[in-house]
Amino acid sequence: MSITKERKQQLIKEYAITENDTGSSAVQCAILTERINNLTEHFKSNHKDHTSRRGLLVLVGRRRRLLNYIKKNSLSEYLDLISKLGIRKVK
């Protein structure tokens, strides 16, 4: 259900702005998206896991707030990020 250390490092390397960037909004969105995708796969076989479903909703809300922040500050970065992550636009 959680992501491995190697996968997290790969996401950081892919979405980082600078070499030592581990906490930028784009990196955080990429990691949250990976966790959301993992939980979505988990629910395909564990549909009664309501506690984790609430955790999923918390993660989706956190990602939505980060995407709104990116959209407010840099629209081009936002559009590039959602196309790379394969998610829809935030309303």
Curated annotation (Swiss-Prot):
Keywords, alphabetical: Ribonucleoprotein, Ribosomal protein, RNA-binding, rRNA-binding
PROSITE patterns linked: RIBOSOMAL_S15
Domain of life: Bacteria
Single GO molecular function: structural constituent of ribosome
Keyword Zinc-finger among UniProt keywords: no
Gene3D superfamilies named in the record: 6.10.250.3130, S15/NS1, RNA-binding
Protein's GO biological process: translation
Entry-linked CDD domains: Ribosomal_S15p_S13e
Signal peptide: none
UniProt key word Isomerase: no
Gene Ontology CC, one term: cytosolic small ribosomal subunit
InterPro entries registered for this protein in UniProt: Ribosomal_uS15, Ribosomal_uS15_bac-type, uS15_NS1_RNA-bd_sf
Pfam entry (one): Ribosomal_S15
Stated family: Belongs to the universal ribosomal protein uS15 family.
NCBIfam families for the chain: S15_bact
Subunit architecture: Part of the 30S ribosomal subunit. Forms a bridge to the 50S subunit in the 70S ribosome, contacting the 23S rRNA.
Function of the molecule: One of the primary rRNA binding proteins, it binds directly to 16S rRNA where it helps nucleate assembly of the platform of the 30S subunit by binding and bridging several RNA helices of the 16S rRNA. Forms an intersubunit bridge (bridge B4) with the 23S rRNA of the 50S subunit in the ribosome.
HAMAP family with a match to the protein in the record: Ribosomal_uS15_B
PANTHER family linked: RIBOSOMAL PROTEIN S15, BACTERIAL AND ORGANELLAR, SMALL RIBOSOMAL SUBUNIT PROTEIN US15M
Designated name of the protein: Small ribosomal subunit protein uS15
Annotated organism of origin: Rickettsia akari (strain Hartford)
Gene field: rpsO
